[in-house]
């Protein structure tokens, strides 16, 4: 929308948005990450979003990656319309479009995987991570997972066990076992004293301790 950002309301959120935000908790869960953020999406075009009150915002989130080419992109809309007339859902059955996409992904994969990999399509990031955990455990025969403090991997059962942060974990335990968390080697707010060493070395030594000391259960 031209002119963004632009605010037509004298208050934020505007009156129409306030009504929707007030009603929302009565009918849907507000446990989403931005569930209480005082903004309502109504329309989107390009890199802009409009709320019910006509206020225009610049979207720098790209719809969490879903709208990387912009909202309401003409080619995307055309593809959605064309495919919806042909086939909207195929459950777990093979279908031509999914097969075409898997072939393209294999052809552009990094060296070593190019034309030598298969795809598994999931409905969400958390779902993809859950599948990756099952796949890794099945293929390797191992059950321990190492993740970094401060990392976000999802909010389903297994993915939530790997994710850290009170806003994601408080009240939902106990979590899946076999998960080990280690500090990321970044000097800003590094949790351990360095003793003259770099944070990369100290973090590496701690990971070595976690993985190679019997009583850490790793």
Predicted stretch roles:
Residues 19, 23, 79-82, 100, ...:
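A non-catalytic, amphipathic alpha-helix used as a structural packing/dimerization or gating element
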Residues 6-9, 14, 56-146:
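Glycine-rich loop-to-alpha-helix module at the N-terminal edge of alpha/beta enzyme cores
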Residues 103-218:
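PLP-dependent aspartate aminotransferase-fold enzymes
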Residues 24, 57-61, 209:
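Beta-strand scaffold of nucleotide-dependent catalytic cores
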Residues 38-59:
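Active-site and channel-lining beta-strand-loop segments
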Residues 1-45, 203:
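Active-site-adjacent loop/helix segments that line or gate small-molecule/cofactor pockets in enzymes
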Residues 50, 69-70, 161-163:
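Short beta-strand-to-turn element immediately C-terminal to the catalytic PLP-Schiff-base lysine
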Residues 27-34, 87, 112, 214-218:
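Short secondary-structure junctions and interdomain/linker hinges
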């Amino acid at each position: 929308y031209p002119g963004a950002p632009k605010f037509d309301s004298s208050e934020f959120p505007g009156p129409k948005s306030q009504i929707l935000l007030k009603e929302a908790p009565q009918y849907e869960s507000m446990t989403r990450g931005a569930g209480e953020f005082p903004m309502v999406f109504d329309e989107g075009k390009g890199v802009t979003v409009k709320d019910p009150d006509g206020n225009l915002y610049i979207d720098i989130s790209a719809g969490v990656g879903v709208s990387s080419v912009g909202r309401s992109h003409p080619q995307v809309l055309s593809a959605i319309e064309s495919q919806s007339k042909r086939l909207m859902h195929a459950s777990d059955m093979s279908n031509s479009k999914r097969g075409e996409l898997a072939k393209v992904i294999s052809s552009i994969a990094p060296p070593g995987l190019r034309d030598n990999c298969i795809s598994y399509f999931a409905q969400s990031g958390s779902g993809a991570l859950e599948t990756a955990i099952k796949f890794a455990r099945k293929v390797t025969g191992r059950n321990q997972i190492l993740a970094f403090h401060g990392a976000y991997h999802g909010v389903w059962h297994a993915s939530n066990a790997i994710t850290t942060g009170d806003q994601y974990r408080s009240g939902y335990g106990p979590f899946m076992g076999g998960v080990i968390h280690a500090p990321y080697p970044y000097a800003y707010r590094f949790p351990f004293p360095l003793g003259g060493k770099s944070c990369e070395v100290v973090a590496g030594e701690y990971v070595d301790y976690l993985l190679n000391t019997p009583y850490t259960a790793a």
